[in-house]
Amino acid sequence: MTEGPCGLSPTAAIIVTRVRRAPVRTTRATVLFADLRGYMGMAERLPAARVVPLLDEFLGALAFAVETCGGRVFHMAGDGMMAGFGVDGEGGHGASQALAAGHTMLRDFSPIAARWRSELSIDSAIGVGLHEGEVAVGVLGPSHHRATTLVGDTVNVAARLCSRARAGEVLFSSTVAAALDGNESAAAPGLPPFLQLPQFELRGRRSPIDIWCVPALERLAL
């Protein structure tokens, strides 16, 4: 008899694969990406062991903002985070919660950045990107390290918006703007007026997208 993976018979291999493969569901949600600006300079100047507690403090502030605003952290890696809002289908698609989380991240990280600048002579800030749309919720990874994550074009666009955002800025797409429907002040009181920016062309994507930003209060070259 021909053996399948790991010496299993073909039938047994199929059964094991089916057991391991969790169901995938689709939903509409708002995806948030955030990353640390100035991280490369930090990592170059400081010993690696000194960077660890700084990243832990940074990611802790981001996770607190996500959880406080009703979202869920799906991925942390290095100096960045991916979170989802409205993934469970409660309270709409999560646009207002995601915007509130982005605003909270900027607000809560500001004193941390000031302290790092004072104590370590390091300039740092956060960039945030938001996009609302359909996502697939699934479990990925080897059997010993599986994790629930979000997949799809919505995730890719949110990540690209985060990369495009300037330090201290929240960028979001037209789908987020439409979902807010003028309720942005209720979602995150104290936000400065939104600015509509020129269309953003994403490499590999057929059409550009309309984008808005919550501008940075202070322009930083990071």
Language-model segments: residues:
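A short glycine-enriched loop-to-beta-strand structural element that forms part of the catalytic core
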Residues: A83-G84, I122-G138
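Catalytic NTP-binding/metal-coordinating core of nucleotidyl cyclase/transferase enzymes
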Residues: R18-A100
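Short, surface-exposed loop/helix-turn segments at secondary-structure junctions
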Residues: L140-G152, S185-P193
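Acidic/histidine metal-binding catalytic segments
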Residues: A77-G78, S118-G127, V170-V176
